[in-house]
Design a protein with these regions (language model features):
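Pre-Walker A (pre-P-loop) alpha-helix and adjacent loop at the N terminus of AAA/AAA+ ATPase modules
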Residues: 55-101
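Walker A/P-loop
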Residues: 87-124
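Conserved C-terminal "switch" segment of AAA+ ATPases
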Residues: 54-59, 72, 209-210, 218, ...
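Conserved AAA+/SF3 P-loop NTPase catalytic/coupling segment centered on the Walker-B
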Residues: 154-178, 192, 207-217, 228-237
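Conserved catalytic/switch belt of AAA+ P-loop NTPases
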Residues: 86, 168-190, 196-198, 202
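C-terminal engagement/docking regions of AAA+ P-loop ATPases
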Residues: 23-32, 36-49, 56, 290-370
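AAA+/SF3 P-loop NTPase mechanochemical coupling elements
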Residues: 146-155, 184-201, 212-221, 225, ...
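Conserved alpha-helical scaffold flanking the Walker A/P-loop in AAA+ ATPase domains
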Residues: 82-85, 138-159, 187
């Protein structure tokens, strides 16, 4: 999610705006060894129903969750932050990456740190909807059919390589994500709460993959891109592996920061973070701009605006504030929109990247002063 070296190349007359990246320290005016994830400087309090104690609790929970996850999982801080923002926003995430970058380990570590049950489904071409949500099985003793829950009945679900299965299979998962329940033979079965899905997909160019329909992609709050680790992170991975400590032992060292009920409580509290009218207008302008912006053939739905606002609330709370600002919206633009827009044929012929086009779009929107 890095900002292009020359983003104005796509929009020569664009006005400067805030950076569209979680962790690009240079664009935040920070030194490389500083972090833009949490604001250290005191900020004035604005009208909000979220009190100071709750705000401080959010920031503390974020720090502790990251510390626990890092006991087993190295690097990928954008993945960690984006996932936590989506989780406490009540959304789900789609993660695109090549195999071998530790996505399963991350999901397991997240489940441990949250005190939630973890489940995993490996999507394959022959996987059926009943393999995911469950099925009715005949009980010989009672001479009745009983429901046998599928692996989806957990709290933190890793849906691995979702684009390797046909549409009807991942459609069953996406329906459950939307409704919070699974329907089998006309009977509705509620899923545990909280229910959070981390779906992964290989790059679409990979062999044996199916392109997810736009309507299904829209159900994911964020699309996060997990890139290869930096040289320092890769060295740390090798050093940790050389200590001959089993992954199970590292996971066992993770202590729950929250209980499942507290996850639900904080998710509800995030709604109380104040959003100024000017910020609502800013989000609407960004989303509407995708529908007629050069090099975009298909724009984002209103669901994108809902995701931006709710994500900004949570990011502000993680940063220790009870009100959101444009600096909480801008970093979420790429993960919120990159899977909700389609490049025009001309842009594809020119080899444009969707992130570059969206960054230019963001720079063309005037940033409000609150």
């Amino acid at each position: 999610m890095s900002v292009p070296s020359d983003p104005n190349r796509l929009a020569p007359d664009a006005a400067p705006t805030r950076p569209a990246s979680f962790l690009d320290a240079a664009t935040y005016g920070l030194a490389p060894n500083e972090t833009p994830l949490l604001d250290d400087a005191p900020t004035p309090t604005k009208s909000s129903r979220l009190d100071d104690a709750a705000t401080a609790r959010f920031a503390d929970v974020y720090r502790r969750l990251v510390a626990e996850i890092e006991k087993a999982f190295v690097g990928q801080r954008e993945l960690v932050l984006g996932t936590l923002v989506a989780l406490f926003s009540g959304g789900h995430v789609l993660v695109e990456s090549v195999p071998g970058l530790g996505k399963t380990l991350f999901a397991q570590a997240l489940g441990r740190a949250l005190g939630c049950r973890f489940g995993r489904v490996q999507f394959t071409p022959d996987l059926t909807p009943s393999d995911v949500v469950g099925a009715l099985v005949f009980n010989a003793k009672t001479q009745e059919f009983t429901f046998r829950p599928g692996p989806i009945f957990t709290q933190i679900l890793l849906a691995d390589e979702i684009n390797r299965s046909p549409a009807k299979t991942h459609a069953a998962l996406l329906e459950a994500m939307q409704e919070g329940a699974a329907t089998v033979d006309g009977q509705t079965h509620p899923l545990p709460r909280p229910f959070f899905t981390i779906a992964t997909q290989n790059p679409i160019e990979s062999e044996g993959t199916y392109r997810l329909p736009e309507a299904q992609l829209d159900r994911f709050m964020f699309k996060l891109v997990a890139d290869y680790p930096s040289a320092d992170e890769e060295t740390q991975i090798l050093v940790e592996h050389g200590k001959n400590v089993a992954l199970s032992a590292k996971l066992d060292a993770i202590r729950p920061v929250l209980a499942a009920e507290e996850v639900l409580e904080l998710t509800s509290l995030a709604n109380d973070v104040y959003v100024a009218p000017q910020l609502f207008d800013y989000v609407v302008k960004i989303v509407r701009a995708t529908r007629d912006f050069p090099r975009l053939a298909f724009g984002a739905s209103p669901r994108a605006g809902l995701a931006l606002v709710q994500g900004a609330r949570v990011l502000a709370a993680f940063r220790g504030r009870n009100y959101a600002t444009p600096d909480d919206v801008a970093p979420l633009v790429l993960p919120t929109l990159r899977h909700r827009v389609i490049l025009s044929p001309e842009a594809e012929i020119e080899g444009r990247r969707v992130d570059d086009v969206l960054t230019a779009l963001l720079r063309s929107i005037e940033t409000p002063r609150l």
